[in-house]
Amino acid sequence: MAFMPPFGPQGTQQAPTAPPPQSPPPRPLTASALAVDPGAIRGCLFRNTYIWPRNGQGFWFYPTFVGRTSVSGFRWNGFFWMYSGISLDRIESFTCF
């Protein structure tokens, strides 16, 4: 069965209406061991969240769904929010506001 997050009212998820902050926050001093705990990132639902992946550059994310092994929502591409998802084991650390 394919991963299908729940949808909001009228069958669509709502992207944020404003861009995220201009600059990324300071990186946390501690990183997760193997994978981010779903309960920890669940506190960031519907909030601007900065994600540092294990590989690659960090990015702004607006999570709308947290599953056992992944999180989905909207990723800022520098111009607009795009619907996206990421596996929790690919996240090294995160901070939400």
What are the language-model segments listed below?
Residues F59-F65:
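Short beta-strand-centered aromatic/proline hotspots
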Residues V66-V71, C96-F97:
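Short, conserved beta-turn/loop elements at beta-strand boundaries and strand-helix junctions
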Residues M1-N55, W81-F97:
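Short glycine-rich, low-complexity segments
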Residues I51, V71-R75:
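SH3/SH3-like beta-barrel fold
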Residues G67-R68, G78-W81:
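Short, surface-exposed beta-strand-loop junctions and turns on beta-sheet-rich folds
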